[in-house]
Amino acid sequence: MAVKRISITEFVSMMEQYPILDVRSPLEYAHAHMKNAYSLPLFSDEERKVVGTAYKQQGKQPAIKLGLNYFGVKMVSMVTEVEAIIAANSDPNNKVVLVHCWRGGMRSAGVAWLLDLYGYTVYTLAGGYKAYRNWVLAQFTIEYQFKVIGGYTGSGKTETLHALQASNEPIIDLEGIAHHKGSTFGNLGQPVQPSQEQFENLLAQSLYKITASHHYIWIEDESRRIGHVNIPAQLFEQMRKSKLYFLDIP
């Protein structure tokens, strides 16, 4: 079965259903990636650097040969790793995977060819992670109907937000996404904060998922900066203009 190259719109619509294989280098993935994507690097960070240098200094074909030399010895281990990823998912009989690299070029094409040869149904992202980032930024220009929970420090804003979530109300937990507990506790007891780019990725995907089934979103009143990440400017302006539900606790 031939590899299918799809748009970012199609790719995003399939992200909740099938495993996402990010074939960029480990450092690229560590900086920021799609939510729930698995890291399956075609090249190590050093190999990527060497191939890039060869491309600039010697040209395309010598760089491709070098890349193939790196790729060849990894083929079996990469297939084995994908088998483990598939087995870890809810449907072990699923043979569909989504693959992307930085710009939808040779890295994703190479891994997609291998997995297609092995019998998987493979979809690659046209434009790669770069197209995804454009999609992420576009989510912050959409008009949302926010219901903003405000109140003084200690009034229970976060607890109220989580109570709404427990009642199946649609919420966005900005502090949770940022791994930060607000002005009082900061990142005490939290995982390391994500990069700004990763924060945006997680936030965009949360907005997309909620608005697929709800026309409003509960959100906590925040300053624009949460730890060392910032709420995107256009989204923050929307929050400022949205209806505020102030918790006036005696």
Where does each model-flagged region fall?
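A short glycine-rich beta-strand->turn/loop micro-motif centered on a GG-aromatic cluster
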Residues: 98, 120-133, 173-178
